[in-house]
Amino acid sequence: MPINSFENYPMSWKPSIDKAEKPIYKALAGQLEQDILNGVLLPGTKLPPQRELADYLDLNVSTISKAFKVCELKGLLSATVGSGTFVSYDALSNAYLLEDTKPTHLIEMGAILPDHASYEPLLYQLKNMVHEEDYEKWFSYGRAGESLWQKDAAVKLIQRGGFETSVDHILFANGGQNAIAATLASLCKPGDRIGVDHHTYPGLKTVASLLSVQIVPIKSENDEMSPESLEYACKNENIKGLYLIPDYHNPTTSFMSVENRRMVADIVKKYNLFVIEDASYHLLNKNPLPALASFAPQQVIHIASLSKSLAPGLRLAYVAVPRQYKEPISKALYNLNITVSPLLAELTARTIVSNQFEVLIESHREQTIRRNQLVNRYVAGYTCLGVETGIFRWLLLPGKMSGAEFEELAARLGVQVYAAERFVVGNSCPERAVRVSVCAPKTLEELEQGLMILRRLLDDLT
């Protein structure tokens, strides 16, 4: 029997469970998950203290702890030292933002894609490859990435993005997401924690959830990770690693200053953290800043993805890995992939060593600048963060409408944007903002049409 009476006692959650269902902690976790997904418990709700809930249900505190842990590993809850346990602000984002309720014709301004520029340099290389006498080898398994000259090409591309490395550090992955998954799978075990920005790349969140790796939001200061907050997390949150997007941060478009990169590098070296540096957007910058890996080469796994800067269909990423992590990450990539596509590895390497990749990048950059000029014209008077070479922008909303509400309303009118709720981490409060993909619309006319709709929505909010 409970020690105290709870008849008139205020509690944010008073579950009712069948104690005959064993194990009890799983039944309680299932009830908690359903109450979150069904909207009984809203994002940001603080749950009762574990001892209080244990008394109410007449259960051991350890049973409550296990149930909370199950939901925490699923990303439904966020526990903060000294503050308690909360329903994560992003707990419902996948449930209500990804439903298949889109109109038949929707102007795509949510997904991040480079512009639809000419892929002539790639086509030229591809035609040459398939007309070679031994063209069959491009369609076999092979050992793509083992060729030294292909690794030389990888080094050239990574150096172009701001990091000096060598071939003995290079691994090949089937895209950036694949490289992130392999890194977390090899360096983390279930329950381990990694630090991230309070809004971050959703693909990182899904991989972490799949592997039961917890992500801890680190507070920002002046639009970049606060060294003081990072140090606090190292001391009190027991984080094992860090995930960062230093350039064209997804979704907020911010850049880490060189000084901030140095300070973060000093902290990760001090606490021996591994760092995943997502360099998906480095090449968009004509004069890239030094990569974070430049300041902590023994700690940072530098991932140079090609889909955002060259072509979405190039599902390939070059990974510069510190020696201490190379063997476990290499094994993880092998177990996940066996190999990368010999066709894509060869095509990409030829495009790089011939310098044709510079033609592709410059073409993308010119088109992106033109598109951003349109964006600036239509959202003039509103706060739309980002630079002219960025392929997405971060639109801060006037009034009191949430990003999720704006996304839903925009979709009804024929435009897809992505709300801050898709990107928020744990119990961080989502900004009232949406991410707007500048280059996803197929034509300038389609982009302009989408911007006109967004402008009308913004004007209605003021």
From Swiss-Prot:
InterPro entries to which the protein is assigned, alphabetical: Aminotransferase_I/II_large (IPR004839), HTH_trans_reg/aminotransferase (IPR051446), PyrdxlP-dep_Trfase (IPR015424), PyrdxlP-dep_Trfase_major (IPR015421), PyrdxlP-dep_Trfase_small (IPR015422), Tscrpt_reg_HTH_GntR (IPR000524), WH-like_DNA-bd_sf (IPR036388), WH_DNA-bd_sf (IPR036390)
HTH gntR-type domain mapped to chain residues: 22-90
GO biological process: biosynthetic process
Cofactor(s) needed for function: pyridoxal 5'-phosphate
An MF annotation (GO) of this entry: DNA-binding transcription factor activity
Cysteines joined through disulfide linkages: none
Modified residues (N6-(pyridoxal phosphate)lysine): 308
A Pfam family reported for this protein in Swiss-Prot or TrEMBL: GntR
Domain of life: Bacteria
Key words, A-Z: Aminotransferase, DNA-binding, Pyridoxal phosphate, Transcription, Transcription regulation, Transferase
Keyword Nucleotide-binding listed: no
Record keyword Aminoacyl-tRNA synthetase present: no
PROSITE patterns tied to this protein: HTH_GNTR
Positions of the DNA-binding region: 50-69
Gene3D superfamilies for the chain: Aspartate Aminotransferase, domain 1 (3.90.1150.10), Type I PLP-dependent aspartate aminotransferase-like (Major domain) (3.40.640.10), Winged helix-like DNA-binding domain superfamily/Winged helix DNA-binding domain (1.10.10.10)
Entry similarity comment: In the C-terminal section; belongs to the class-I pyridoxal-phosphate-dependent aminotransferase family.
Descriptive protein name: Uncharacterized HTH-type transcriptional regulator YdeF
Organism: Bacillus subtilis (strain 168)
Lineage: Bacteria, Bacillati, Bacillota, Bacilli, Bacillales
UniProt gene name: ydeF
